Structure formats: structure tokens, C-alpha cells
Amino acid sequence: MMIYNSNNIPAIHTYKDAVRYGARVLKQADIDNPDYDALELFLYVTGIDRTTYLINATDEIDNEALRKYLVYIIKRSHHIPLQHIMGYTYFYGRKYIVNEHVLVPRQDTEVLVEEVAKLTSADSRVLDMCTGSGCIIISLASLGHTYSGIHGAVGVDVSLDALEVAQNNKDINNVPYVELIQSDMFEALEGRGMKFDVIVSNPPYIPTRVIKGLDEEVRLHDPFIALDGDEDGLKFYRIITDKARDYLNKDGYLCYEIGHDQAAKVSDILSSYG
């Protein structure tokens, strides 16, 4: 652990001084992309954009902003995710609130959104199982690739805390017709006559035994429930694939995000359930 106090902080007068110092602290703490994170935290604290920073890099930083900045730098040096410190991230060009109750949306999942968008239109009914932050279903709705009527865009999650985050993201992205349902998989959907053109899911898919070896930022700060795919990582693919036929329209699609080494096994699951 690294501890910083007034005795080991060099003189910091300008914007540039602060960011350089922040980057140095993060580099010493083995943070990936320390320069990027140091600048992002500075922009967050000061409320300026990159262009303003570059133009005014030699401006004097006020003491209160510097104090806040150093607090955030120390948090980041302890491997608290950048997005958790700021409370938001960007996904598919839109802002999303994130916290310890949801996975931070990742670039790989943007690819899933792109692929589903190719299969959908403004008339499509889409179910996002294990919705988490809501980034998948909200992105599709924002793109106009879901039906805007009842049950046109549905996100399901077992976690009420995650659904609270998704509700906030639905509000800030102005897609009021996205329906969020608390349910253990399909349980709360049974008997409601819901049918979908696409079921999409980025479920928990990491084998339990692997989680303890994950990067500290994931292992300690992402919710375990959103990571753990049981013994072989495939539990939720089996459940969703088994139930999907009851909720898909004829010629509907089932779309998954999968782990880098799971393609063959998930294909086998899909084949085994027809």
C-alpha cells in the first residue's frame, strides 16, 4: 500500500503539474494507462474538457480542486475502478451510471449490440436477460431498434440494486418505454404471454474457480453475482437456451456474449436444445 502526505507531494501549481503527479502515482501503483486515468480524473474534478485542459494547462489550480483530485488519485491507486470513482462511463456513445452493483459496460459488449442491431428494427420486440446496468437494451432502444409499445423492450435481472441502476440509465437516456423486471431468469415472465423477436444476454459466464485469479479491479469491485457462471461457467447459457423457445417468436434469434474460450461449448448447448 502506498501512503501520500504533504511531506512527499511535490509542489503542484498548475493543471499540468497535477496531472503529471497523478500519472506518476498511478504508474507506481501499477495502474494500466496511468496517463489516461490521471487526466480523466482531473477533467472529472474540474468539469473541463480535454481541449480546455490543453489550452489552459499552465493555469493555476485552486486548492480545493487539487485536494479532491488527490483524493481520487489515491482511490485509483488502490485499484478502485475509474468508472466507480466517477460514477459513470460511456457505452455505445451514451452515458451510463455505474456502481458496485453492476458490471462496468465493456467494449466487447458494444459488438454484441452492433450484431443485434443488424437483426432488429423499430418493430422488433427484444428481451435482455441479465440486464445489469441496462446498457444493451437501452442502447438498442435508443437506436430505434426496438418496438416502443408494451413489452417491446424488456430488461430482466435478479438484482434489485442492478435494476435501480438500470432505471437511472433508462431515465438519463430518455427511453421511458424500456420495461425493467425483477426476476430470477424467466420466472416473473411466466404466464404473461410475452414473445420476442430477439433474446439477448451477457450472462455471468466465469467459472467459479477462475474468479479468484481475476484482475483485482474485477475480482474485488465487480459484483460476484454478475461474474459467477457456476462450476463450468455455462449454467446460465443452459437455463436461457432451454427456456428461450417458450419466449421467442417464429424465426426469432438468441444472441449471447460469451467467454473467449466458450464458443464450442455454447454451440453444443444450443445444438442440444435444438
Task: Label every PLM stretch briefly.
Residues M1-T46, Y53-L54:
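Non-catalytic accessory regions of SAM-dependent methyltransferases
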Residues G149, Y205-K235:
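Mobile active-site "lid"/loop adjacent to the S-adenosyl-L-methionine
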Residues V116, L140, V218, I240, ...:
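Class I S-adenosylmethionine-dependent transferase superfamily signal
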